[in-house]
Amino acid sequence: MLGLGVDRLQADINRLLASLFHQGVLDEQFLQLQQLQDETSPNFVYDVINIYFDESEKLLRNLRLLLMDREFSDYKKIGLHLNQLVGSSSSIGARRVRNVCVAFRSASELSNRPGCLRGLEVVEHEYHYLKNMMHELFQLEQQRILAAGVRYPM
């Protein structure tokens, strides 16, 4: 009986991941991240993604503060924050976040304040979408683990 619930949850996980890949939210780097997870580190992906979210929140907050300062003119500082966000997004396979960061960085290289404000808005939107989808994925995975039951080595 437990197997049916586990199978249904695994199918839900597979559908969600397929959708995220189809939408371009994730890329193959996310699959490589998943392959690093094993029995010795069963929470590896969850931990790495949560570190990404914690660090990204700081970067987004810094970008927002910089752009809210009407006297701001140091667009190189914006570029540095965006480079960090591009790198960390690439490392976890957050394709759409990475892509919109690259577009935002182009606006900062042109010292285009309206373009930067719009870029920040788009990055925040994509970031929050990714965060919500990862939360949903991790909830499904947790339910699948619980449905499978605890197995003790014999």
From Swiss-Prot:
One of its GO terms (cellular component) is cytoplasm. It is found in: Cytoplasm, Cytosol; Nucleus. Gene3D superfamilies: HPT domain (1.20.120.160). It holds the Pfam family Hpt. GO terms for molecular function: protein histidine kinase binding. GO terms for biological process: cytokinin-activated signaling pathway; phosphorelay signal transduction system; response to cytokinin; xylem development. The modification N-acetylmethionine is found at residue 1. Keywords: Acetylation, Cytokinin signaling pathway, Cytoplasm, Nucleus, Two-component regulatory system. Residues 41-137 form the HPt domain. It comes from the Eukaryota. InterPro entries: AHP1-5/YPD1 (IPR045871), HPT_dom_sf (IPR036641), Sig_transdc_His_kin_Hpt_dom (IPR008207). PANTHER family: PHOSPHORELAY INTERMEDIATE PROTEIN YPD1, PSEUDO HISTIDINE-CONTAINING PHOSPHOTRANSFER PROTEIN 6. Interacts with AHK5. This is Pseudo histidine-containing phosphotransfer protein 6. The gene is AHP6.
